[in-house]
Amino acid sequence: LNGKISDIADPALLKDGQRLVDILAKKIADKAKIRIIGDYDIDGVMSTYILVKALKRAGACVDYMIPDRVKDGYGLNVHLIDKAYEDGIDTVVTCDNGIAAIEEIAHAKELGMTVLVTDHHAVPFEDIKGIKIYKESKADAVVNPHQIECSYPYKELCGAAAVSYTHLTLPTK
């Protein structure tokens, strides 16, 4: 309750944070269509709101989808990717989901799409004789403090905080 701004860790420590910003900056400059796919809980909605506002302020051609819990289920799925592709979307960015969407991201990549993941959930793994083998997607950038290679000190960020790096570092139009 009595924190200071200096108590916040440097968001540049988030693995792939700068890569994600660089990709988005290029997509904005190229006038590429970007779709944010959030989650239906409050963290997903706020994450989506933060990122849509940041991208619009930077001059992006951006829209968003919040999946229907009953119809679409949780997170990124093939139906949402196919819909984005049909709509001429170049880049899909997830908010508060995507870390476990290995096959779905592979599908988007096969369609030639750029995929950026912002998430805070645990990285999926396979346990082989007591050894955790972490699963990785073919996303172009993944911002998630739970990644093994991520040096961000606060692993329990919410999804909205995981998109904060983009919000803080994208240029404004």
Feature names for model-found ranges:
Residues 169-173:
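A short, hydrophobic C-terminal helix/tail in secreted or cell-surface proteins
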